[in-house]
Design a protein with these regions (language model features):
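Intracellular juxtamembrane helix-capping segments at the cytosolic ends
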Residues: 133-146
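Short amphipathic helix-loop junctions that connect adjacent transmembrane helices
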Residues: 50-66, 70
Length: 207
């Protein structure tokens, strides 16, 4: 059945499109370069959610309840991804992306200031809202900023840049956790998030 389905699918041939030979900043305008830069800055502070689960354990949550926190933010992220995507279609990508950063900034600040059960749960809710607003809108904004003939290649390059910055994020967070204290990774992430929000103000959306 799979063979029959794929045999009937015909890929449209690209016409008059020059193949993109590698990733080069020469093909990017300053606006897109700035957005890749700010996304990379944010990724440096976007450590793994595993730290949030460990943090909850350190705040007194029992081992059996920690998976509930994981389920909480994943369900929120899944439930709100579509509404945030629809909202970005109405009001633009930048406002929703700014909202996504704001959710995480508030979550990080909450983890710094409040270590009680209620504060941690609210932090996980905000983290879920952050993921719901960030993931669909960020890639969409990049795709709208790039020339159509380079779209797939630059999207791949964007993901590579984010991935390379995300790799040391958890390592840095772990070192800060061990050497400075539990709140140190959240301080760093909060500062980098605020910096990303400031840079985002200078990004111009394609109308």
């Amino acid at each position: 059945s799979s063979f029959l389905i794929f045999s009937r699918i015909k890929e449209r041939k690209a016409e008059n499109i020059q193949a993109y030979k590698g990733i080069s900043f020469r093909h990017l305008d300053d606006n897109l370069k700035l957005f890749i830069f700010l996304s990379s800055v944010f990724a440096l502070g976007a450590f793994s959610y595993s730290f949030l689960l460990i943090y909850a354990r350190e705040c007194g949550f029992k081992v059996g309840f920690v998976p509930v926190l994981y389920l909480l933010f994943t369900l929120i992220a899944a439930a709100f991804s579509l509404p945030f995507g629809q909202l970005s279609d109405k009001i633009g990508r930048k406002p929703v992306l700014f909202l996504a950063y704001s959710f995480w900034a508030l979550a990080a600040l909450g983890f710094i200031l409040f270590r009680g059960y209620t504060g941690v749960i609210i932090g996980f809710v905000l983290y879920g809202l952050h993921k719901a607003a960030l993931d669909p809108v960020q890639k969409t904004l990049v795709s709208e900023l790039v020339p159509s003939e380079y779209k797939a290649s630059i999207l791949g390059g964007f993901q590579m840049a984010i991935g390379l910055c995300a790799l040391p994020a958890s390592l840095i967070a772990g070192l800060l956790w061990d050497k400075v204290g539990l709140a140190a990774p959240f301080y760093l992430s909060f500062v980098l998030t605020i910096l990303s929000m400031c840079i985002l103000l200078f990004i111009k959306e394609v109308k």
